[in-house]
Swiss-Prot record:
Domain of life (superkingdom): Eukaryota
Record propeptide residues: 1-104
Protein name: Tumor necrosis factor ligand superfamily member 13
A Pfam entry, by short name: TNF
Gene that this sequence comes from: TNFSF13
Glycosylated residue positions: 124
Organism: Homo sapiens
Quaternary organization: Homotrimer.
Induction profile: Down-regulated by phorbol myristate acetate/ionomycin treatment.
Domain THD: 116-250
Family (UniProt): Belongs to the tumor necrosis factor family.
Length: 250
C-alpha cells in the first residue's frame, strides 16, 4: 500500500487563507460597539446639559418670584391658571372691597348723625323794654356735624334725636335771687326744659354766683332753644368760662 501524503490529509480551505483564523467579523463587531458607546455617552451628556439649563431657568424664576413677592397681578406668574379663574378672583376681590367701602360709608354717616356737638359762648346780653327778661346772644365756639344751628339768641334743631343739654350763667348782680330758664319753642307751643335759681350776696364785691343746669331731652326738628334770665338788665359775666350753652347728640 502506498504511503499517504501529508498534503492529502490537510483540510481544504478557501484560497489565500492558508488555514489561518477568521478575524474580519470580530473586528467589525468591536468597531460597532465602540461607536455605539460613544454615541450613548454623547446623548447622555446632551441630556444632562438640557436638564441643567432647565434647572437654572427654574431657579431664576423662583428668585424672581421671591423678589417681587409673588406672581404679577395680570397672571403672568401663573401661566397654568385659566382666565375664568382669574376673572372670578378679581370679581370676588372687587366685591369684598365694595362691601368694605359701603360699611365704612354707613358707619361714617351714622357717626356724623349721632355725634353732633355745639358749644356756644356769649356775645352780649340785652333786655327788651316790653318784658322783664334778659336774653343772651350766642356764637359757636365748638361745632361738629350739621344737626344744630346757632341763630342769634337761640339754637335751631336740624336733626331730631336725644341730646345732652347744659347751660351756665355767671351772675354779677346784687339782686337777692338770680336764675336762668332754658326753654324750647316748637310744634306750636313753648316749654320750659329746666331752670336754676341762686341767692346773691348783697355786697357788690361778693356778688358773684353761677347757675349751672344740665339734662337729657328728646328734641324735634325745627325746635328753637334759648336761655332767658327773668330779670330786666341783669348783670352777667360774659366770659367764655363763666357763661356758656352746649348740646351733644347721644
Amino acid at each position: 500500500m502506498p504511503a499517504s501524503s501529508p498534503f492529502l490529509l490537510a483540510p481544504k480551505g478557501p484560497p489565500g487563507n492558508m488555514g489561518g483564523p477568521v478575524r474580519e467579523p470580530a473586528l467589525s463587531v468591536a468597531l460597532w460597539l465602540s461607536w455605539g458607546a460613544a454615541l450613548g455617552a454623547v446623548a447622555c451628556a446632551m441630556a444632562l446639559l438640557t436638564q441643567q439649563t432647565e434647572l437654572q431657568s427654574l431657579r431664576r424664576e423662583v428668585s424672581r418670584l421671591q423678589g417681587t413677592g409673588g406672581p404679577s397681578q395680570n397672571g403672568e406668574g401663573y401661566p397654568w391658571q385659566s382666565l375664568p379663574e382669574q376673572s372670578s378672583d378679581a370679581l370676588e376681590a372687587w366685591e369684598n372691597g365694595e362691601r368694605s367701602r359701603k360699611r365704612r360709608a354707613v358707619l361714617t354717616q351714622k357717626q356724623k348723625k349721632q355725634h353732633s356737638v355745639l358749644h356756644l359762648v356769649p356775645i352780649n346780653a340785652t333786655s327788651k323794654d316790653d318784658s322783664d327778661v334778659t336774653e343772651v346772644m350766642w356764637q359757636p365756639a365748638l361745632r361738629r356735624g350739621r344737626g344744630l344751628q346757632a341763630q342769634g339768641y337761640g339754637v335751631r334743631i336740624q336733626d331730631a334725636g336725644v341730646y345732652l343739654l347744659y347751660s351756665q350763667v355767671l351772675f354779677q348782680d346784687v339782686t337777692f335771687t338770680m336764675g336762668q330758664v332754658v326753654s324750647r319753642e316748637g310744634q306750636g307751643r313753648q316749654e320750659t326744659l329746666f331752670r336754676c335759681i341762686r341767692s346773691m350776696p348783697s355786697h357788690p364785691d361778693r356778688a358773684y354766683n353761677s347757675c349751672y343746669s344740665a339734662g337729657v331731652f328728646h328734641l324735634h326738628q325745627g325746635d328753637i332753644l334759648s336761655v332767658i334770665i327773668p330779670r330786666a338788665r341783669a348783670k352777667l359775666n360774659l366770659s367764655p368760662h363763666g357763661t356758656f350753652l352746649g348740646f351733644v347728640k347721644l
